[in-house]
Amino acid sequence: MLPAVGVDRPVGRRLQLHARVQQGIGVRSIAWSRVQAVALLAVVRDRQAAVQTPRVGQHQAVVQRNRRRHVRRARQGVADGRQHLGHARRAERDDLCVQEGGGDIEIQALVRAFEQDGVECELDPLALGLADVSAAVGVIGQTGRRLQLLEFIGEDVHRQAKTVRRPTQPGLIGGDGFGIERQGLGLGEDRGAVEAAAAIAGPRRDEDVQVRGKGVFGRDPTRHVVVLEGAVPDEGIGRGEGLGEGRDAPRVQVVVAPAEGRLVAGVTQTARQGQLVGQVIVDLAEHGEAVARLLVQVVVLGPGRIAGPVGVEVDIVRDVEGAHDPVQTTVVVVAQTHFQRGLVQRLIGIEARGRIGRAVAVALHRASRALDVADHRQIQVIAQTMLQRRRHAIDVDAMGRILRRIELVRVVVLARIGDIAVQRRRDTVVLARVAPVAAAEQLHGQVGVRREIEGDSGPAGEQILVAETFTAARIDDGRNLGLGHAGDDRLEARQVARARPGHEAAPCSASTASRTPTVSLRGPPTAASIAR
């Protein structure tokens, strides 16, 4: 069964729209227009044009074969466009932004009639370009890369003559830092909206849809939850390109729905441990919002080669419903490392409770260079020592067995403030560690050790190195947005990171931390469980 992409409700806004008539050689485009709602998924690939993946082959094959996926309650199919940009473009608009230079931009669009209440479709994610993304989400803090779900108002443009599919003329412009451009990290000048003008194939060969508008997704972060579930594609693309050699490449299932959500992820814990604790106290104005952004990156190994990383982005939103004075919202972040030679003793369930503003996950491309962290001056992360050594970690998946094999896990927690919060400088809270992941053969109760991957070996040459894990992310009662570790009862005040210089963060007692632990042996999160 093909993954499904659903839009939970029709577009409720009329955006600024500029219909544009394109003119080709020997073809004059004059037509009438009618307004339609367009759910558009803009996918920006890596800025390095040399980075290519087999997914492009299938992407093109879908176009060449003129295949259309079934779209329920809709009268149009899925179109695509690709354009190589030789130089960077930029503009400044509103609060969503993407910058692209010297790479490929792919824009996919699902068009439905405006009178429909909603749209559900069964699509090949490769045709949507989801598996074609380089580092839209997975490269933590990489400026200029983004995967953004947009809602657009489009217009049908009926052409006078039949024409072939035209490349997209995108204007995905501006700088992007995963929404942290309002945190005083030097990205404020690059704030801009994602503005796209795309030629979208209509139901007839002589009809295209010109789309130009502003995305509305970022303005209302509590409307959608987008969740990834991995699967293995069961078909190649033909012509010797793409998935013939990489049938293990992950598929992506994207589910869009408003939800009171819960995210459960399995991680491993053993005896030796190290600890990171951070706490940031921020002030919110009335009707403001506090967003704790949890970014988890996993490098996935295929049979004998790198299959590509998986990026997971979760925004957890807590609104301030009313306050005469700015409300102090506490964000506590605890990270803990566990290592031991031997068997992994247990799994810790990590739960995120509360209203989830957005969770975006996407399968990324195979190039290991996509894991390079961008500007260390803007976002403080720990260098990835695993990238210099090609290790094999088998059948251990700290993100709930989304995919078969992983190499490393990186966790970054960012705390940011919404648009209407009290304007003041706040330092980003970033807790990140990179470590080898357990080399194990199974993850069913007891874990059999497969091989040594690093460090001193035991008598039998067996060793397990477990990736440093991260905290549960959860919203406590009241107006506190709390993140606490499932296996740690102690928060050390001396390790507390503060939101701004001179602001003394309140110490967190052991009793406070003891209320947040959660231990679970449940399986990976599903779209249905999160939707609940």
UniProtKB/Swiss-Prot annotation:
Q: Which GO terms fall under molecular function for this chain's record?
A: oxidoreductase activity
The pathway it acts in is: Carotenoid biosynthesis; lycopene biosynthesis
What is the enzyme's main class?
oxidoreductase
Keyword annotations for this protein?
Carotenoid biosynthesis, FAD, Flavoprotein, NAD, Oxidoreductase
* Composition skew (Polar residues), residue ranges: 509-519
Name the coenzymes or cofactors required: NAD(+); NADP(+); FAD
- Protein name from the UniProt record: Phytoene dehydrogenase
Q: What species does this protein belong to?
A: Synechocystis sp. (strain PCC 6714)
Q: What is the lineage of its organism?
A: Bacteria, Bacillati, Cyanobacteriota, Cyanophyceae, Synechococcales
